[in-house]
Structures are given as C-alpha cells and as structure tokens.
Amino acid sequence: MAAPFDAFFATARPGPLGQRLCIWHAPHDGSAPKSLIVFIHGFAEEMNKSRRMAALQSRAFAAAGHAVLQMDLLGCGDSAGDFGDATWQDWIDDVVDAVRIARARHTQSWPGAAQPALWLWGHRMGCLLATAAAPRIEGGCNFLFWQPTPNGKAVLQQFLRLETAAALMGKAPPAGRPSAKDGLAAGSGVEVAGYRLSPGLAHGLEAARLAPPASGANRRMEWLDVAPQAQDAASPVAQQVLTTWGSAGWSARHRSIVGPMFWQTTEIEDAPDLIATSSSALTSGAVRLGSPCFVDTAVAA
C-alpha cells in the first residue's frame, strides 16, 4: 500500500538550486488513483495565505481516491533558492518537472498500473503557469483553476502597488532610488514587500495569458471563483476567456462559490464549499465533452 502522505525533497534539475520540496498525497484506501493532480501555488504572499486551503483540498482529493503532488517552486517555501533567483521560465520548468515527479511516484507506488488522467490544479498565478507548461506535457492534461487571473500583467501590477501602499504608510524607499516599475524596466531586480523580484520573472509574468493549449479535444477546464456574496454569473472577462477555450475544443465550465477570499485575508481562513465543489468537479458528469463551451454557474450554499 502506498504511503498516504509523504514530504520529501526531489531534484528538479542539477545544481545548487535544483532541490524542490514535494508533498505527496496518495488515495487513503491504498488503491491506484482515479487521477493524478499536480498543484501549482500562487504568487508571493498569496502562496503563504493559501497553504492551509491547499493542504485541506489535497487531503480531500486523496480521500476521494485521487493522488496529489504539491511542490514549492524555485525560491518559494522550503525549496532551494531565494525568490529573487527565479525567472518565469524557471517556474514553467518546475511545473513540467512536478508532473514528471508525480508520474514517477505513481509508477513506483503502483507498478504496472496505467497512468491516470492528469489534472493541473492552479491557484491564481499558478493557473497561468499551468497553461504555459501544458504544451510540454506528454499525453495532455485537464485543468482545475482556483480564482484564475486572465493575464499576468494584472498580477504584476497588483504586486507593484504594494510599494505605493508602503509609501503611503511612511515606508517610502530611500531618496534617489528608482521605483520598482522603473527598476524592472531598466533590467534590474527590485524589492517589493520583502520579496526580491527579478526582471526575468516580472517580464515573463507580465506577458502571460490564460490561453488554451491546442490539444483541447476531450479535455476539461474547471474554473472556480470564490466571492463573499453569491454571483449570478461569471464576469464578462471570465466569460470571454471561457468562450475562447470552448472555441479551441475544450469543455469549459465556470462555477462561483460563496466564501472568504482566503489568499488575501488578514487571518488564515477556510472556504469549505470550495473544497467540496472542487472534489465534485473532477468526477461530475455535467461537463459535455466536445461542446464549444458550457458555462454552469452554481453557487454553493
């Protein structure tokens, strides 16, 4: 029987920055998993705020018969390197490596069992990384998106605003030092809210889009949004993205869940309805495979 939970360091690539912290969740009953899920965390402090929710969801998936791999990206959490060491391409490579590690762990745990369907489960910025890495993943994948951002430019702008917020609170940078935006434009690394940001990460993030991979036939994309109050429908921006995915052959579905926006709350909070909806999304038969686009907004109570 496979160990239900295991934390370990894996070598993503050679060199001093190659070690990645991984957490493996196997199906609780020890059977071969229904699917293989790789979690891709959010950006900077959003990752830290979401640690608990990611762990709770991973355990829920394992209890439902799925296998999950969580991996800290380069410079994040307990993986090698500092945040400022990472580029956008490094993180894309990490997602590809995480899939390789997860598949190898599956083969080791259940020799002879066929590789199950693969899901890339992203949170916020992690959704952008998932779509960027997908063309390099053999056999294709499905997507589970938690509060995805349609483009990385918005993520970067929101992060850089933290510098302005700090200045308003009397924590302005030293006189004569360029703003973070100007520093990045000049090709220099900058520090914002305690995080060192490299130009290679900032520029790659800024150019990222939530674009559908080409191989969409018989593939699924589940988009789950969380809001404090019930939402009648997906936002116009989300609807446009969903339509684009549907036109590319993906079966795309949106659902809105009532709950706290845990990745930005002051205190660590849980969104139990998001966990329940995510677990059901992987097995729900409501998605019509091959349809241009199916948008089903269901608000959890």
Language model segments and positions:
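N-terminal cap/lid segment of alpha/beta-hydrolase-fold proteins
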Residues: 1-35, 297-298
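Short, surface-exposed "cap/lid" segments of acyl-processing enzymes
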Residues: 26-72
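Short beta-to-alpha linker loops that shape the active-site pocket of alpha/beta-hydrolase fold enzymes
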Residues: 43, 67, 72-77, 149, ...
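Short glycine-enriched, charge-decorated loop/helix-capping segments at active-site entrances
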Residues: 53-54, 82-88, 268-269
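Catalytic nucleophile-loop/oxyanion-hole region of alpha/beta-hydrolase
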Residues: 76-110, 114-115
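Gly/Ala-rich beta-loop-alpha elbow adjacent to hydrolase catalytic centers
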Residues: 119-130, 147
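Active-site signature of alpha/beta-hydrolase-fold catalytic machinery across serine-
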Residues: 132-136
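The alpha/beta-hydrolase serine catalytic core
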Residues: 137-275, 279
